[in-house]
Amino acid sequence: MSCPKRLLSSSLPLLITSKYRTGYEGVTLRRLDTMLRQCNAHGYFIGLNCHVCNEEGKFIMSDREMSGIGRLMAGVLRHFPEKFNLEMDINGWINIGSMTDSFKEQRHYYHWLRPWHFKAICECDDKGRFQIEGDMIRATYAHSIEIELDHPTDDIPEALYWPCNPEEIETYLELGLKPSEKQNYVHLSKTIRNAMEAGHVHINRPAIIEIDTTRSIADGHVIYRAGTTVFLTEAVLPSYIDVMPSDDPVIQEIVSEWEEEEAAKEEE
């Protein structure tokens, strides 16, 4: 008996148990780590069992497939829709059906892709990177192409956070925050932890700048709610920023977690 090529090629490493979930007798193939599944009662989820009712649910895609499609979605919706011959409107929206067809045409290993697969990825993305309205989809932040944002501007926290290299703090205190060359907006984080995690991608021990959003908004500057933890603004003046002390309890807790992870890796 042979199993479907897509499952075998995209679901390694595999745990062999007693019954393959789609009806093949003899084996069950499951990822040892994460996968995207669907519970009939509670919708899409990541993991082996529904977080609400603990039912196994229906297999949708492996973590490798989810990661690969997610990266492709981010690239197309943020940076290069023209490479996939897709039309984007002024607010960043692209037709889901057209994107499905284009992905299948240009990436043949996604021949199984359907529009609802994009919905599954969007609903399980804890960063809120994507938004679906009807039959349209867009990225919520990190665009390098020019679009006109129509994100909500209400319910902005009193303070937001931004990570930076500790050696560059004085520059930001003097000049404020401006978008990078690859982005159209300054991307601010909802919490210190969010900012630390964002900064840790490129900086070993990022410093954290706190932004007084109450004063900024009162002075007429617009801040948008984009992803789940991401907020956007065109710039932040020096008068609205301050540096979080390195001995802040939250920062110290996160650094301790990183140090434990690093020590564990060295022991492997």
Task: Give the ranges of each region predicted by the language model.
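Eukaryotic, polar/proline-rich low-complexity intrinsically disordered regions
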Residues: 2-268
